[in-house]
């Protein structure tokens, strides 16, 4: 949402501390960083907000504050035949509405996970050269499933069926995990040639895991 007379500009203050060091003639690169971010005037949709054909969308959002913090680790290796890196991130992102009136609060005014709250994220990327023409590449990704709000019960009220939902973002979709593998073949390296060719045969999602994106 853009800032308007009814919606204040969003503000953020961030602090970070990092340590970086290389080893073995710079063939190994490492880093570690921690951070904390304080956010103000964040907005989120109220419960049962109307999102379609709504000319007064600003009336269905609530302002609040938030914070996020985390740790990032990274290592890269670059040697004669092996080149790759591995990273791991632990992070949390939470929100809370600032309204004084209980009816205006989301999640009863308690902290809740933002839509971007994914505590664990890990990536492994590597390439190994078996020869000047043949190499193998690996790409592995893992992340915690993002948070969602689910209906947990239903009841009858006034002759109609009603749905009771969980706390805001009280559940998560299944974790995401994927491995990609490829074999790369370079053309010959003759100096006098009009063009250079290369072939790559890859398998996306090697384990065939069904990774949900949205529920």
Kindly label every feature range from the protein language model.
Residues 1, 42-51, 56, 91, ...:
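Outer-membrane beta-barrel translocator domains and adjoining extracellular loop/strand segments
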Residues 1-31, 36-38, 50-79, 115-119, ...:
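Outer-membrane beta-barrel signature, preferentially recognizing the C-terminal barrel domain
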Residues 3-5, 110-113, 166-172, 188:
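Active-site rim elements
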Residues 12, 23-26, 78-82, 91, ...:
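Outer-membrane beta-barrel channels and translocator barrels
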Residues 15, 71, 124, 181, ...:
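Residue-level detector of short, conserved catalytic/binding motifs and their immediate flanks
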Residues 18-20, 31-35, 87-89, 139-141, ...:
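Transmembrane beta-strands of outer-membrane beta-barrel proteins
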Residues 35-38, 57-150:
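Gram-negative outer-membrane beta-barrel transporters
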Residues 39-40, 133, 141-160, 174-180, ...:
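C-terminal beta-signal and adjacent terminal beta-strands/loops
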């Amino acid at each position: 949402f853009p800032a308007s007379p009814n919606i204040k500009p969003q503000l953020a203050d961030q602090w970070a501390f990092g340590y970086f060091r290389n080893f073995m003639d710079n063939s190994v690169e490492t880093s570690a960083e921690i951070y904390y971010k304080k956010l103000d005037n964040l907005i989120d949709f109220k419960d049962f907000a109307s999102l379609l054909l709504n000319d007064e969308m600003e009336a269905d959002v609530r302002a609040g504050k938030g914070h996020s913090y985390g740790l990032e680790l990274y290592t890269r290796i670059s040697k004669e035949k092996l080149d790759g890196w591995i990273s791991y991130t632990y992070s949390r992102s939470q929100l809370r509405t600032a309204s004084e009136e209980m009816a205006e609060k989301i999640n009863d005014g308690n902290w809740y996970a933002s839509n971007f709250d994914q505590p664990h994220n890990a990536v492994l990327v590597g390439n190994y050269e078996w020869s000047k023409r043949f190499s193998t590449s690996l790409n592995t990704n893992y992340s915690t499933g993002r948070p969602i709000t689910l209906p947990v019960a239903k009841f009858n009220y006034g002759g109609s069926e009603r749905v009771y939902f969980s706390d805001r973002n009280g559940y998560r979709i299944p974790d995401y995990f994927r491995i990609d593998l490829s074999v790369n073949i370079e053309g010959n390296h003759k100096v006098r040639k009009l063009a250079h060719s290369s072939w790559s045969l890859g398998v996306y999602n090697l384990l065939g895991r069904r990774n949900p994106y949205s529920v």
